[in-house]
Design a protein with these regions (language model features):
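Conserved redox-active cysteine motifs that mediate thiol-disulfide chemistry
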Residues: 2-17
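Generic hydrophobic, helix-prone segments enriched in Leu/Val/Ile
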Residues: 13, 55, 62, 124-128
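Thioredoxin-like thiol-disulfide oxidoreductase module
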Residues: 21-22, 27-112, 116
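C-terminal partner/receptor-binding element of secreted or periplasmic proteins
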Residues: 106-135
Length: 135
């Protein structure tokens, strides 16, 4: 997950992923790594070296943060936080959902999770409930 210390949506995504109702689900299915980018001038030392280049490589450098990608165990791209038109390939820049909150964004998130894990219906429903919760 690409993030910055000043990014409110980044903190919200982190809090949601670590919420007691779904943390174990994510921990069993994903390894979450934080890469810090776009820090303010007085916090540039907190940026991870090479993170911006990595973000650019995966087409996320101009569409906002948080931005997340899912790679397989060999580092092959599987999915990311961009909603693209049906049938569009990875090279088509879409709309970044960042921290999913709207119905469309949460649906995209659930679709990605369903394709990149072995999550069952109950687990996906718990994630949906947490992300659609307005608190």
């Amino acid at each position: 997950m690409f993030h910055a210390s000043w990014c409110g949506w980044c903190h919200k995504l982190d809090s949601s992923l670590n919420h007691e109702s779904i943390k174990d689900i994510f921990d069993k299915n994903y390894v979450t790594t934080h890469l810090t980018v776009y820090e303010s001038k007085n916090k540039k030392e907190f940026e991870n070296p090479g993170a911006l280049e990595f973000l650019t490589r995966y087409k996320g450098n101009d569409i906002g943060i948080p931005y997340w990608i899912i790679l397989d165990k060999n580092g092959k791209w599987l999915a990311d936080s961009q909603i693209r038109p049906e049938g569009a390939d990875y090279n088509h820049v879409g709309e970044n959902v960042g921290c999913p909150a709207s119905r469309e964004e949460v649906n995209h998130f659930l679709k990605v999770l369903g394709k990149t894990s072995t999550l069952n219906g109950t687990e996906l429903m718990a994630i949906e409930k947490k992300f659609l919760l307005k608190k």
